[in-house]
Amino acid sequence: MAAACRSEAGLLPSLLCRRPAGAQLLRVALCLLCWVPAAVDAVPELGLWTRTVNDKSGPLVFRKTMFNSTEIKFSVKSFSCSGPVKFTIEWHLKYHTCHNDYPDLEEELSQRHELHADPDVCAYFKNIDCWTTKSENLDCSSDSQAFPSLNNKELTGIRNISSQEGSTDVVARTQKDGFHIFIVSIKTEKTDAVWDLNVSLSMVGPHGYISASDWPLMIFYMVMCIVYILYGVLWLLWSACYWKDILRIQFWIAAVIFLGMLEKAVFYSEYQNINSTGLSTQGLLIFAELISAVKRTLARLLVIIVSLGYGIVKPRLGTVMHRVIGLGLLYLIFAAIEGVMRVIGGSKHLAVVLTDIVLAVIDSIFVWFIFISLAQTMKTLRLRKNTVKFSLYRHFTNTLIFAVLASIVFMVWTTKTFRIAKCQSDWMELWVDDAFWSFLFSVILIVIMFLWRPSANNQRYAFMPLIDDSDDEVEEFMVTSENLTEGIKLRASKTVSNGTAKPTSDNFDEDLKWVEENIPSSFTDVALPVLVDSDEEIMTRSEIAEKMFSSEKIM
């Protein structure tokens, strides 16, 4: 959730409240912001695979974005052969420029295998950037203790290969940075032979098992983890220095910082684990997604309660807080489902697509809530002429506007580069699609931290009942006026036959006596002291009243 940006400091708040067209445009921009990925787009690419292959299996296909000079190792860990069998194992390494090339390669190769056709893989790729090697006459029988080693003889003479551990299993080496497809085809002389192989494939680059597209993302998570640690230390120092003046909103900020630090640490540990072992720990990934869902939910709630003026304009949110928490719980549930299903079933799973739609709708509600609340809060502060708090929210609004504009520009760029491009070749920039949103929120968070930081002037931003309740003065005055008139009796008037009202007494002294007996002294002396007139005003009013009574007598 969540978004923010800078503009003209003095003009923006007035534009938000005075220009409906501009407000509608901002609302549309905020709604567009919701249709963006909320977390890591997919599971990191593996670097180590184990497969079971038998006489009925088709070619094995592996895809990965690799650095130049990445070593591909292939070995048979265990085997089972019904009789003497001679194997021919071919491997094909294909470099391709576009990430979206050959989406149906696995299905086509399986169909050719079922038709017992001998597929020429490099011919399928038109022999462009495709390298083929093979090992022939590999004997396997029930008496064999070990499967013959596999290696590419063309690579054994290269410097430093013989000194590396497991170099005898190196069957291919990449020559470029980019997208690669590695295909393993296992054949036997006897088509009716029964056999079973348990094979292992690893791809080790200059930095480890991690792919070329995930390497920058791992560094990014490490840097962001350090950034959040610095955020936490800075916030802790601020809070320790001014712990007596801590506001309630500042506890929310501390919770978001802690969850952000935990989220980045868990994701970094998962990427580091893949880089070290080549395998992904599904439980760790699920835990990371759940932490990410909690953090994103709390981050959205933080922006909402800041926009509502919690602790700044209002001492409590009342029933509005129930709606905010309910919306947050709804988002948390669907965000957790989306993250777990993406780890288990992949980003194209039906449940992931449906939850993405629901999350987009909930995010739209969040954005609408934030926009309406922020506009109302700034309007209230402007009416109260509270320049200190108004300046605070003006800077916060400018930050949100900046983030909205930055998000729109980024979405246009990613759509053009990764979504609708015929050739998705910018693999070096894939990590930006995931990292941008985390970086953008960290910018919003540091702005919120700076604006709402603990300081000696904390109480200038805190809710002050004697000052901030001015918008309720009219209502309170009406209630007080009703209570003050409870002890006042209405003076009855007599009417004559023609319906004309007649004074109850012709004597002005009797009228004054009636006032003294029926109007409580507390009303004039205590409740409304400002209504007590001076002696001169009383004499003037008495003369006017006498003239009115005299004119009525004459009539």
Curated annotation (Swiss-Prot):
Residues 1-42 form the signal peptide. The chain crosses the membrane at residues 217-237, 249-269, 301-321, 324-344, 352-372, 395-415, 430-450. The modification Phosphoserine is found at S470, S497, S534. Keywords: Glycoprotein, Golgi apparatus, Membrane, Phosphoprotein, Signal, Transmembrane, Transmembrane helix. It comes from the Eukaryota. It is a multi-pass membrane protein. One of its GO terms (cellular component) is cytosol. Glycans are attached at N68, N160, N198, N275. It is found in: Golgi apparatus membrane. Residues 43-216, 270-300, 345-351, 416-429 are lumenal. One of its GO terms (biological process) is retrograde transport, endosome to Golgi. Residues 238-248, 322-323, 373-394, 451-555 are cytoplasmic. It holds the Pfam family TMEM87A-B_GOLD. Belongs to the LU7TM family. TMEM87 subfamily. May be involved in retrograde transport from endosomes to the trans-Golgi network (TGN). This is Transmembrane protein 87B. It comes from Mus musculus. The gene is Tmem87b.
